[in-house]
Amino acid sequence: MLSPLGETLRRHDPDRFLTVLFAPEARRETLVTLYAFNHELARAREVASQSLLALMRLQWWREVVEGEAKGHEVATPLLAMLADGRLDAGDLLALIEAREAEVDGDFPTLEAWCDWLLAGAGGLAVAAGRALGVTDDGVLRGLRLRGAAYGVAGLLRARLVLGRQGRAPWPTDHLAALDMTAEAAAADPTDARLRDLFAHLAEEGRGFLAEARVLPAPPRAAIAAALPAVLARRDLRHMPSVDPRPRGLGDRLAVTFAGLMGRV
């Protein structure tokens, strides 16, 4: 039976919810809590009308991770898992820092953009791996790369939604080369000038996956942390559509097969 937090995760982050099902039963709730925490960090940027308000919400979560008890459906189990070592405070603080950089929204170069994804979506995959017992640096690096690839795919899939929110989290030097500002890119994510940029960013995501493949594979017990890469690989095979379809049976079967086989 799912916990209430698990039901919430299924509604708000169905991709990662599916991957949780392939974690050892004793550690599933830890992943559910970690991913629910990540969703709360994402909401801080999405629901706040001003950057200052988003930063205030992120500061609230920083205080939770640093040990301040607050009544909240995610904060309460999160604190318990930090206290008993199931989750690592350093990993969670790094995720908050990545979200703070997202609020700032300035990625001056492609390298800075990639570093942000490696810290954010990649850092979440590392935190999941550690929660599942991974300690090998090579395996953790592979998880970081796979998580970053999933982050690339997610941004490209969501670019219309991001535009409606007034956001264009793309490398500003590449936008400038197109004679575009971030504001213009947010106003019209379908502008033909952006097509080559998005294709290039998708190639960066595929590069993350290629680099991960030469690193040690995660053990079967930690395969759940790597499974978002299955979806990233499918999404990035071709540049994600401007209006992507909801996840279908093929996506779910691909994740299920990889989870049952224990390899990505």
Give the role of each language-model region.
Residues 1-80, 92-99, 117-126, 136-156, ...:
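Catalytic cores of Mg2+-dependent Asp-rich isoprenoid enzymes
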Residues 85-87, 220:
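Structured, non-catalytic alpha/beta "coupling" segments that mediate domain-domain communication
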Residues 100-112:
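Acidic/His metal-coordination segments adjacent to aromatic residues that form catalytic metal sites
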Residues 127-131:
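Alpha-helical transmembrane segments of multipass membrane proteins
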